[in-house]
Amino acid sequence: MRIINAEGLILGRLASRVAKMLLEGEEVVIVNAEKAVITGNREVIFSKYKQRTGLRTLTNPRRGPFYPKRSDEIVRRTIRGMLPWKTDRGRKAFKRLKVYVGIPKEFKDKQLETIVEAHVSRLSRPKYVTVGEVAKFLGGKF
């Protein structure tokens, strides 16, 4: 089992690396999901996520698609988009993923990994928003 600290990691790069690990059969736990980073212009990011939450089907609005508002679920959904979700292999891989806000008690004393290639310090122009800020904007709990 790999425990990855998402603090200061770019969400898309983190998601692609984690999706690869999941497809290889590893169990992955992500902690500090609210501290992951989405790069780009703040207003554009907020408008994109706000537009997603308003999507619905005109015939039956209860059918979806449903987009998350909590920060841990935003990270899970991003990783799900990089897996072959409609196949049995992709669904089994997705079940091996756990995402947490903060660090739970059972992982406090464990060794946390980070992904150096996905760190925000590698950006030349540091324009970004944390996943926690996006979740707060959408009305999520965390």
Swiss-Prot record:
Assigned GO CC terms: cytosolic large ribosomal subunit
GO biological process: negative regulation of translation; translation
Pfam families reported in the protein's UniProt record: Ribosomal_L13
Keywords assigned by UniProt, alphabetized: Ribonucleoprotein, Ribosomal protein
InterPro entries referenced in this protein's UniProt entry, alphabetically: Ribosomal_uL13, Ribosomal_uL13_bac-type, Ribosomal_uL13_CS, Ribosomal_uL13_euk/arc, Ribosomal_uL13_sf
One GO MF term attached to the UniProt entry: structural constituent of ribosome
The family this protein is said to belong to: Belongs to the universal ribosomal protein uL13 family.
Subunit structure: Part of the 50S ribosomal subunit.
Function, as annotated: This protein is one of the early assembly proteins of the 50S ribosomal subunit, although it is not seen to bind rRNA by itself. It is important during the early stages of 50S assembly.
Name of the molecule in the record: Large ribosomal subunit protein uL13
Gene: rpl13
